[in-house]
UniProtKB/Swiss-Prot annotation:
This is Dephospho-CoA kinase. Its main location: cytoplasm. PROSITE patterns: DPCK. Pathway: Cofactor biosynthesis; coenzyme A biosynthesis; CoA from (R)-pantothenate: step 5/5. It comes from Synechococcus sp. (strain JA-3-3Ab) (Cyanobacteria bacterium Yellowstone A-Prime). One of its GO terms (molecular function) is ATP binding. Keywords: ATP-binding, Coenzyme A biosynthesis, Cytoplasm, Kinase, Nucleotide-binding, Transferase.
Amino acid sequence: MRIIGLTGGIATGKSTVARILERHGIPVADADQMARQALAVGSPIRERVLQRYGRAIQDPSGALDRRQLGRIVFADAAERAWLEAQIHPFVKARLREFLEAHGASAPPEEATEARPSCQCPHGEGHPTVCLMIPLLFEAHMENWASEIWVVTCTPEQQRQRLAQRDLLTAAEIEARLASQWPLEEKARRAHVVLDNSGSLAQLEAQVRQALGAHPREGGAICPTPPSRIE
């Protein structure tokens, strides 16, 4: 089975690539959506978060103020690490369920390889699935995928998209960018690099080319220098 690990920098266009893949009939698991589910009303994780931060992350109606929570954790690495320690196990469990539902198996929980593994999970199911994991490298989850795709754009585009999409201040944008690996390092470790600095049509063409290239044998892909899809 071909398991695409889709990642990149914040606001580089990962969700756009995911939608393109879905139009090609490829199932996509969204780790960000799973993280939001972890903080849903009634979840024990949400209760622990509220116990830790209290009214500081609640709006006047009592609902969870995600932007205020973001201000706290992106300003303090220790708080961000605590929050990730609450959410990541939940997300990994949901990703594991997704893979099993499509006939694959996730790596052992103790396995943490620094590079993508040549041992691709086997199974009878959909021939290609995608795990969209924004923090794939930061969470050391490279070995969950048989190949890694990194979506890039220019730094100026990243900042512009964050300002328009999330209504963040310049300081908030820089804090979020600083919390992730440099985009250049992610691209260096990728099997496929998708340049999303152009048009949607150009991005779609790159995705089609990457899907067709499929440089594998026997259901696995070995670490190779990244392929830049133009």
